[in-house]
C-alpha cells in the first residue's frame, strides 16, 4: 500500500500527481499485465536470442556506413 503524506496547505491535485508518479515507479500495473498470460521460458529465451541477433545486425550495419 502506498502512503503519500500530504503537507499543510498542499493542493490535492499535487498530492494526487505525486501518488500517481509513485504508483508508476512501483510497476504494479506492468507486473499485473505480465502475469495475466504465462509465457513459456523457451519462448522467452528464443525472443531474447532473436532480439540480440537483430541488435547485432543493426550495429554491424551502422559500422559499415
UniProtKB/Swiss-Prot annotation:
- According to its record, what are the GO cellular component terms? ribonucleoprotein complex; ribosome
- Tell me yes or no: is RNA-binding among this UniProt entry's keywords: no
Q: Which keywords, in A-to-Z order, does the entry hold?
A: Ribonucleoprotein, Ribosomal protein
The GO terms this record gives for MF are: structural constituent of ribosome
Record's keyword annotation contains Ribosomal protein = yes
Q: What InterPro entries does the database record attribute to this sequence? A: Ribosomal_bS21, Ribosomal_bS21_sf
Report the family membership.
Belongs to the bacterial ribosomal protein bS21 family.
Designated name of the protein: Small ribosomal subunit protein bS21
Organism this protein belongs to? Flavobacterium psychrophilum (strain ATCC 49511 / DSM 21280 / CIP 103535 / JIP02/86)
Amino acid at each position: 500500500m502506498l502512503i503519500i503524506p500530504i503537507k499543510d496547505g498542499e493542493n490535492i491535485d499535487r498530492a494526487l500527481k505525486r501518488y500517481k508518479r509513485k504508483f508508476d515507479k512501483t510497476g504494479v500495473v506492468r507486473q499485473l499485465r505480465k502475469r495475466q498470460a504465462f509465457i513459456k521460458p523457451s519462448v522467452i529465451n528464443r525472443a531474447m536470442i532473436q532480439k540480440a541477433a537483430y541488435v547485432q545486425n543493426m550495429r554491424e550495419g551502422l559500422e559499415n556506413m
